[in-house]
Amino acid sequence: MVLNCCHFQVLDILELYRRIYEEFLAIPVIKGKKSELEKFAGGLYTTSVEAFIPNTGRGVQGATSHCLGQNFSKMFEINFENEKGEKAMVWQNSWAYSTRTIGVMVMVHGDDKGLVLPPKVASVQVIVIPVPYKDADTQGIFDACNATVETLCEAGIRASADLRDNYSPGWKYSHWEMRGVPLRIEIGPKDLANNQVRAVRRDNGAKVDLPRDCLLKKVEELIENIQDSLFNAAKQKRDACVQIVKTWDEFVVAVSQKKLILAPWCDEEEVEKDVKARTKGEMGAAKSLCSPLEQPEMPEGTKCFASGKPATKWTYWGRSY
């Protein structure tokens, strides 16, 4: 009964980590269980969310949720008095989510211009930049920028205006693009005259003119769309790297092509050690990343890709950070 409670808590925490990655950071991850060789030393088992960096062909252990059982309570004599008045060993879980997450986000979404931040985690979601021309109503443009920021902030959108007069608009564009701000709003004389603003997306560079009388609604829609687009683009790139293999020769080719490999495995520790040894090279050895909790169907008679023994599960493999 207690072990079941521990198991459910492990999965509950793992789901929270998946939500952080996918719903906030717009990074697709795989929920899975680690092999005995890769699990937390001393624990009963380890689950993880695994991310993948298509540009480098490497996996990243995004976060872990461990069931420790009573192993450590026995080791350190951690007791409690149960409802029967008897001494009993505690059951423990452990979970971890570290700053490597920031690095994963940068590598998954970033481009040659700099950071690309998902709106849900961006400290500044919208940057408003005045674009005054010679002999233009500079003060009117600045006032419109401030009014725009005020409107957005009142609605809970994290917005700011860059009103510095010692930098050109073009310099400011590059400055905020490098910092990954999801949406840029430009206001110039023509925009002022037409009661509109120009919005520019960081993720794809798309530009659109927005009427000021429905600005808030349009900005909210853009922010939501940017968040969804980042996740969908990242998932499409990740999925394009997934390769199913069933033989050792196919596995070796997929490793050389920096793929995220899904293969049938016999779940034997010595076989995994052999895979590491046989793929060791300048880029590092391939290893098991996780066995997905949602297992694809295993056809009867399927053999392990590495040993030829009967396969018991599907497992993701690849090089990793």
Regions found by a protein language model. Give the residues of each.
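NTP/phosphate- and nucleic-acid-binding module
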Residues: 1-321
